[in-house]
């Protein structure tokens, strides 16, 4: 596996990617088909990441239905520190051994995990972790969390709760909804102990229990505080009400962090392609904006995607102005340019309030 580092947008840190050789990719793709045939029947319904026919919007829709159906008053927002780098090979192979009887399949997975990484001209052994970038890595991550988190929650913890609860997970990103505050606090404490058994660490600074639901805003106001919000899959979720004010609504907006990162990434791309001919440049710009709207254009986020398109047009104006004599591109000329190469309209594409 060849390890390369890519910059994390908006951060000085870098993310390691493990890129397997072409032959290994073919073998891994075959292993994925075999393992999926077994584990798709085992995975819990509320595991949405990297599974056939499921995606981020399904997880967001499940969260919306759960919170707005009533009985949810607390949310646990959780974060696992460096999950992919801390998967313990011994535990993963034990988990696989529960369902996979073919020793050849297990040997292939073991070889992939122990293949080592080629970095800076040297081969280094890999004693733990599953490299991000591998074809099979997302599935192995799901299997690891299925045994270390999902089964513990569904078969043990949830049965001891005094009220309703629901865990919604997308890969290593998950939130848990609770009716009772003591259940939420207890989960927060026991989660750390549970994941610690399998070499995983809860990021304490990013894991919190927050009051949420129909009465959270009024209670916060009575205390002179702002209502709490939480982030999940790039969106900030907050307490609100319907237009007539009669019913509670959970609404969402592109998170500030993701918004900054997306704009910074776009700005860096523009800088790198500032000499690209306008027709070719705008073809890619339109595709990028369309992709952003396809993901973030969800119920209640009109403001978020509208602001993104507005900021993209401002960056375009700035960089196109730098091509020639500074100030040569007037606003009038730029408007004509956008008529010739229009940006996608910021319309809501995904309804999170309706069943799929």
What are these regions (language model features)?
Residues 1-356:
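Non-catalytic terminal/accessory segments
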């Amino acid at each position: 596996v060849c390890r390369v580092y890519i910059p994390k947008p908006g951060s000085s840190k870098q993310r390691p990617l493990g890129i397997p050789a072409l032959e290994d990719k073919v073998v891994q793709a075959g292993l994925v088909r075999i393992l999926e045939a077994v584990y798709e029947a085992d995975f819990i319904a509320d595991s949405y990441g990297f599974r056939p026919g499921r995606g981020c919007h399904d997880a967001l829709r499940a969260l919306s239905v759960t919170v707005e159906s009533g009985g949810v008053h607390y949310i646990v927002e959780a974060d696992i520190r460096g999950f992919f780098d801390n998967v313990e090979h011994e535990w993963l192979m034990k988990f696989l051994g529960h369902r996979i009887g073919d020793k050849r399949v297990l040997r292939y997975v073991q070889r992939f995990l122990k293949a080592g990484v080629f970095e800076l001209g040297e081969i280094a052994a890999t004693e733990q972790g599953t490299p991000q970038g591998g074809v099979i890595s997302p599935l192995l991550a799901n299997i690891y969390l299925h045994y270390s988190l999902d089964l513990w929650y569904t078969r043990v913890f949830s049965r001891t709760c005094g009220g309703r609860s629901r865990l919604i997970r997308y890969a290593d990103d998950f939130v848990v909804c609770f009716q009772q505050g003591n259940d939420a606090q207890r989960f927060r404490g026991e989660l750390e102990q549970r994941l610690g058994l399998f070499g995983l660490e809860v990021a304490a600074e990013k894991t919190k229990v927050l009051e949420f639901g129909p009465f959270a805003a009024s209670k916060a106001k009575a205390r002179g505080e702002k209502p709490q919000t939480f982030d999940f899959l790039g969106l900030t979720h907050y307490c609100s009400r319907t237009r007539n004010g009669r019913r509670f609504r959970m609404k969402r907006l592109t998170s500030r962090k993701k918004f900054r990162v997306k704009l910074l990434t776009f700005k860096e791309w523009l800088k790198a392609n500032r000499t690209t001919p306008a027709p070719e440049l705008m073809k890619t710009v339109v595709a990028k904006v369309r992709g952003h709207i396809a993901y973030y254009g969800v119920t209640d986020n009109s403001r978020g995607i509208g602001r993104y398109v507005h900021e993209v047009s401002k960056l375009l104006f700035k960089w196109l102005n730098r091509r020639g004599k500074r100030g040569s591109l007037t606003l009038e000329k730029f408007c004509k340019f956008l008529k010739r190469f229009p940006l996608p309209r910021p319309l809501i594409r995904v309804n999170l309030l309706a069943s799929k």
